[in-house]
Amino acid sequence: KVNDKELIALKIDFEDNTIEAENQTMQDTIVKLNSLKGSTPFFIIGYNYPKIPHKVTEDNELLISNKDIKLEFVTKKVNKSDYKFKINKYGEVFAKNGERVWGYSDTQDFQDHLEAEIFYIRITFVGKEPYLLPKTKYLFNPTLSSVRVYDRENGQYMIDFMGGDGAEGYNALFVFDEKGLIKRYLYRNF
């Protein structure tokens, strides 16, 4: 028997993400959730789940809710003195603890490009205690207007957003339920 909580329904493309290419080559597929690691041989264009409407309440805060869940996505200005980074021989930036840093410019002056960071993502399921979504540190310059939350209609939800800009851009996908984080997948969709 197939467990739908272990699968994810995606809209994918093998082309360059232009509208013209998407109209000709976009397709639906289902993959194992735990197979999303590193880079994939396709571009993730979207998801085959209902999107939950959202509204920005302030410049740095986004609220998303339906009858079962409330999600608050809040950013703050980066305090650069809170961070120590190192650059490897490939120009990739890592925190001193070895964790990869996302949403930066991979040059020696990358700290000048760190403007915003995720302050918190608070999730509240009806009748449950709220919790903060873990593993959001080192995801810099998130774009609030790109945040999308989807109801997987099996007790799980997904939040997808972009961060950074141009060559420093990234996408983040978090799958979660009322108990907490199930999967985090960070990728570059180019």
Question: Language-model features: where?
Answer:
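Exposed acidic/polar residues on beta-strands and adjacent loops within beta-sheet cores, strongest
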Residues: 3-190
